[in-house]
Design a protein with these regions (language model features):
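Extended, charge-rich alpha-helical interface modules
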Residues: 2-113
Length: 113
């Protein structure tokens, strides 16, 4: 099994970076057991989506993708931001086009993806 990839997280803990793009992290204020239940739901929905695609079942795929979206919203990875300081959301934006650009550029090359 390949080693887990490391993706750098922003200093404020709001995002991680994959191929130069910011992705919102889960809400760190979720209770560990709640977070685990939501992650389990997310993984189950992702598996169901993959099976539906392989089976060519468009309705099952739609339901599974809706379940993925619901789990991601509950985790805080989509929808309203989980922080309350009024900072804007840069989810899915290129890090180079955000206030995190200098931080990312300063990372050692081996820490960038």
């Amino acid at each position: 099994m390949p080693a887990a990839q490391h993706h750098p997280s922003t200093p404020d803990g709001r995002y991680f970076v994959v191929r130069g793009r910011l992705w919102r992290l889960s809400n760190p204020h979720l209770a560990p057991d709640v977070r685990q239940q939501l992650v389990d739901q997310l993984m189950r929905a992702r598996r169901e989506a993959g099976l539906a695609v392989k089976a060519g079942d468009k309705e099952a795929e739609r339901r599974a993708r809706a379940a993925v979206d619901a789990a991601k919203h509950a985790l805080g990875e989509r929808g309203p931001v989980w922080w309350d300081d009024g900072a804007p959301d840069y989810n899915r934006r290129l890090v180079a086009n955000t206030p995190y650009a200098a931080w990312y550029a300063a990372l050692p090359a081996g820490d960038r993806d």
